[in-house]
Structure formats: structure tokens, C-alpha cells
Amino acid sequence: YEILRCLVGSEMCIRDRNMIACVDSDYDYLLQGATHTSRYIINNKYVFHTYAYAIENYQCYAEALHEVCVMATLNDHPLVDFVAFMRMYSQIAYPLFIWSVWFYRKHNLSEFSLLDFCSYVKLDRVSVYHPERSLESMSRRVRRKLLELERRHPKALEEIEAMKREFAKLGVNEDNTYMFIQGHHIMDSVVMRLLVPVCNVLRRERETEIKELAEHNMQFHNELTSYQRRQLGVDIVLRKHTSYKLSPLYKKLEADIERFLKHI
């Protein structure tokens, strides 16, 4: 099929059975028709969307991150439990994420924009051996902002709770929130900030192992050179792997496409 950006604001309309559009959902899936773009994307049978915010969220699928590190470093030491880490990240971000979408639904981005939200749910310096510390710092920021928003908008609290129930039906929960946060932010300000130091440690481990097993300097240098040539940048692996095809959201998208193909 043809992949293109759906220009909802233009005169282009996708109604031709010979052409479908595949687009990032952004917040449009969660807005559930609160904007013209959202209505167009979720109601047009010729438009398929990612469900996750964007393709980058799939590339950062937690269950795939260990394999990404293995492919990049050729070291399979499970240094960090990525699934548990991203679950904890999601649980911390979740309540503020609900507020972020609420402001979008109210068309009030001057008070709390997407950029504002992302500034609260980023990681600062990450310790490979104590990654939870970066989450503790983020948690403090999020709690302060939540208290501020709750004081400013006490009448919104019932709506916020209703949105949580609504989002659960849409597949969003406290454990997978990272799949619905801006994709570039998750990749650049969360996952890469974790993967880069992890891969650096894994590479040093493998180089130390090569040195310890080498019987002489020439063997060490030859094997070290060979190892260095076979390494890949973790950013490259992250963008090229396809392990996200096992994710529930991807399976949901696959099912949509299969249903569509049966009726053309």
C-alpha cells in the first residue's frame, strides 16, 4: 500500500479503495473525535493509524530493548530489566499524561502544552547500576505538577477519573503509557538516555573478556579489532529492529488491516 501523510486540512480526501493512508496516531486516537483531525483519522476506513503515538514508540517497545542491546554490543548480559523500568516509567508518567490529553481535548495548550508535559517526564542522568534513581527524580517533578494542576482545576478531577476509565477501554493503562507519549521524546529523552550508558558498559565488559581470554597481545588486538568492527550503533539497531511486531498494539493494527483486505 502507499504510505503518505494525511493532510486533513487540505482538499485531499482519501476515499479511493486503491489507496490507503498509514499515519502516526499522535494524540488523535486518544482525543476520540475532539478535533477535526481526530474524527477524520478514527472514522475513515481508508486511514490506518499506529494506535501508539508514533512509529518511534514501537521501536522503543520495552520487551525488545534487551535484544537491541545484544545486537548492538554482542553481549547478552541482562544488565537492566528494561520491561520493569519502562513499566515504572509509565506508572509515574500516567497521571500527568491524562492531564496532558485533557488539556488537548479542551483546546487549552497555552497552560500545559505537549512540550511542557515532556519536560516533566524526561530522564536526567541515568546510572546503569541504579536506573531507578532517575525515575525518583522524575517522580518528584510529576508529583509537584500534579498538585498544581489539581489545585487550579478542582472541577476537572471527575473528568480525569472518567478519562482513565475511557483510556483503559482504548488500551491505555498505567503500565504501557510510554507507548502513547510523544515518540521522539520517548526515544531521545528516555530510551536512548538509558540504552547508551548500558551499551557502553556492555562493550567494556566484552572488551575485558577478550583481553582476559587472549593468550598474547597480537591475539588480543586482532580479536578486539574484529569485535569493534562487528558492533553497531544502538541508535541504528533501535530504528531497524522489528521485534515490536509482537506488541499488542501492533497486533491490533495488523488485525485492522486484515479486516480491511478481506472486504476489497
Locate predicted features.
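Single conserved hydrophobic/aromatic residue that forms the stacking wall/gate
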Residues: 2-13
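Generic hydrophobic, helix-prone segments enriched in Leu/Val/Ile
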Residues: 5, 53, 92-96, 250-261
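Short, aromatic/basic amphipathic alpha-helical patches
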Residues: 31-41
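Activity-critical C-terminal alpha-helical subdomain
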Residues: 41-219
